[in-house]
């Protein structure tokens, strides 16, 4: 029997727009509207609008919310103020990654966790199995839609729809009940593209109206609706990990290069702390590195990588970078094959093609 794909509240809108949809973790989502490269360049140069409503939202509330979360996540939530967000990971005892997530502090007893779509149920089960005391978990994923407006002109586009001075919401800060075109929104200065921008959490029933308002407001600025294809090439160029590729139960946050989100010295003990502390102190045995192809070919997820004839790892993500026009990839490689300018080989369809280790991120926006 065929499993029915899940749809976001905006499905009808992108169906009408002629978007090409794909199965993404059980969701029927647009891969592109007008073309991946066109959408990618719109975000790098102007702005793009994404439907990210497949992401999960979990409220964690109560007097014991903070202590419970501190024991689950790798970053230090005690450093957060109200209306501040923080990038985080949850790990197993051995240091593998359960998921990467954003934690929003609404107040000292109320947090919003944003989870990867494919992991919503397993994450909630993991959290539920590890919390105790006065804490409640409320899954609000189905009633919450999430739109992302990203790019150098994102703020200007959104400012036309609200009286709220959006420039006052600093990166990784958020404000609740901001009115955009008379729709109440939680507006967060976060994103997954390497550009400035906002993520807008809204009631599912208001999502279509907000989408239309942003598209109309963005037209004079060159804003385009964007699909998963551009979202992936954008995050890849900025070296932002994708769960299931750069991060898995077998790959730690340290190996994946997000050690900044792992505070092994925070006062609260957390799951995976000892394993991650050891990796930080001794250096991980594997590292995520960037490669650029020397020979012609595109490194794709799962391709094996060789150094001096030895298998040293695999490609986690790879593509022809729309911004650079080069064939580049991210590789989880043994540490002794990870130095910049190291010559590697990628096995592409049975042939070993030359590549070299390069600095990442492949793209960094100028402030």
Swiss-Prot record:
Write out the GO biological process terms.
glycine decarboxylation via glycine cleavage system
Q: Which Pfam family, any one, appears in the UniProt record? A: GCV_T
Keywords, A to Z, come to: Aminotransferase, Transferase
**Gene Ontology MF terms in the entry:** aminomethyltransferase activity; transaminase activity
Q: Which reaction does it catalyse?
A: N(6)-[(R)-S(8)-aminomethyldihydrolipoyl]-L-lysyl-[protein] + (6S)-5,6,7,8-tetrahydrofolate = N(6)-[(R)-dihydrolipoyl]-L-lysyl-[protein] + (6R)-5,10-methylene-5,6,7,8-tetrahydrofolate + NH4(+)
EC numbers = 2.1.2.10
User: GO CC: one term?
Assistant: glycine cleavage complex
Cross-referenced InterPro entries = GCS_T, GCS_T_bac, GCST_C, GCV_T_N, GcvT/YgfZ/DmdA, GcvT/YgfZ_C, TrmE/GcvT_dom1
Its job: The glycine cleavage system catalyzes the degradation of glycine.
PANTHER family given in the database record? AMINOMETHYLTRANSFERASE, AMINOMETHYLTRANSFERASE, MITOCHONDRIAL
Q: What is stated as this protein's family in its record?
A: Belongs to the GcvT family.
Query: Assembly state and interactors?
Result: The glycine cleavage system is composed of four proteins: P, T, L and H.
Q: What is this protein called?
A: Aminomethyltransferase
List the top taxonomic levels of the source: Bacteria, Bacillati, Bacillota, Bacilli, Bacillales
């Amino acid at each position: 029997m065929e499993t029915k794909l899940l749809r976001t509240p905006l499905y009808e809108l992108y169906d009408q727009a002629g978007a090409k949809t794909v199965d993404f973790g059980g969701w029927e989502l647009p891969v592109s509207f007008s073309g991946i490269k066109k959408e990618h360049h719109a975000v790098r140069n102007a702005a793009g609008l994404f439907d990210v409503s497949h992401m999960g939202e979990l409220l964690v509330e109560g007097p014991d919310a903070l202590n419970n979360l501190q024991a689950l996540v790798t970053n230090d939530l005690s450093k957060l103020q109200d209306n501040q967000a923080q990038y985080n990971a949850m790990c197993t005892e051995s240091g593998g990654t359960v998921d990467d997530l954003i934690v929003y502090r609404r107040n000292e007893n109320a947090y919003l966790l944003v989870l990867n779509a494919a992991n919503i149920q397993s994450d909630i089960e993991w959290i539920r199995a590890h919390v105790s005391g006065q804490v409640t978990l409320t899954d609000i994923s189905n009633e919450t839609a999430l739109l992302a407006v990203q790019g150098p002109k994102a703020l200007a586009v959104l400012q036309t729809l609200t009286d709220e001075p959006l420039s006052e919401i600093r990166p990784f800060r958020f404000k609740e009940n901001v009115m955009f075109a008379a729709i109440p929104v939680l507006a967060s200065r976060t994103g997954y593209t390497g550009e400035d921008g906002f993520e807008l959490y809204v009631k599912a029933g208001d999502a279509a109206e907000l989408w239309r308002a942003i598209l109309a407001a963005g037209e004079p600025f060159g804003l385009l609706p964007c699909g998963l294809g551009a979202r992936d090439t954008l995050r890849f160029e900025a070296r932002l990990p994708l769960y299931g590729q750069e991060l898995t139960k077998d790959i730690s946050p340290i190996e994946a290069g997000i050690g900044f989100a792992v505070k092994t010295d925070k006062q609260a003990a957390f799951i995976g702390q000892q394993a991650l502390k050891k990796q930080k102190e001794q250096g991980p045995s594997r590292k995520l590195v960037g490669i650029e192809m020397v020979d012609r070919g595109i490194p794709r997820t799962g391709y094996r990588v060789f150094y001096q004839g030895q298998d040293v790892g695999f490609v986690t993500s790879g593509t022809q970078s729309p911004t650079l026009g080069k064939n580049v990839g991210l590789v989880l490689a043994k540490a002794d094959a990870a130095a910049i300018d190291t010559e590697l080989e990628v096995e592409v369809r049975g042939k070993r093609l030359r590549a070299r280790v390069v600095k990442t991120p492949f793209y960094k926006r100028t402030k």
